């Protein structure tokens, strides 16, 4: 006996995504704003259409992606809200990140110093987010007392605006 199977597909309801955004917001303090994580093409559901459908929502602070390429794709498709790169960034991307006002993740003084210099060359400031490793052992500075001094050094660099800090729970 032969089985004929139809191809599987996911139909994404952009109105439902918008409704879900507000359902989450209703559980939070009214002043809390959300960052929508749309990395890996929105986990295969279409980062660009999802981002375009919700970018004007008041409760949305911005978007997060995994790579510089994903961030640039959002910018090239009209996304104007802040974009945070959750993964590593590389020196060849620094000028583009600064010009496009994309927020990189920082967890070493060396990277922060390079970003500060690149921003100075463009006469700009660059907002960054500090990544703390709480057990995933991928990227981030250790969650220990020694990292406090490192964070202070990063925050004191010219052109660097320490906008936030995050972790990925293990």
Positions of predicted regions on the chain:
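Glycine-rich phosphate/diphosphate-binding loops that line cofactor/substrate pockets in enzymes
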Residues: 21-32
């Amino acid at each position: 006996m032969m089985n004929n199977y139809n191809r599987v597909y996911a139909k994404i309801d952009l109105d439902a995504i918008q409704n879900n955004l507000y359902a989450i917001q209703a559980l939070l303090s009214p002043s809390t704003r959300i960052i929508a994580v749309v990395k890996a093409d929105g986990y295969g559901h279409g980062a660009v259409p999802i981002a375009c459908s919700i970018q004007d929502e008041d409760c949305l602070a911005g978007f997060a992606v995994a790579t510089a390429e994903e961030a640039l794709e959002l910018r090239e498709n009209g996304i104007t809200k802040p974009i945070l790169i959750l993964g590593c960034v590389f020196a060849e991307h620094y000028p583009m990140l600064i010009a496009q006002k994309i927020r990189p993740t920082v967890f070493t003084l060396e990277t922060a110093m390079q970003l500060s210099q690149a921003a100075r060359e463009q006469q700009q400031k660059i907002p960054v987010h500090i990544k703390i490793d709480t057990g995933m052992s991928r990227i981030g500075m250790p969650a220990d007392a020694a990292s406090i001094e490192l964070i202070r050094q990063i925050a004191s660099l010219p052109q660097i605006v320490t906008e936030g800090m995050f972790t990925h729970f293990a």
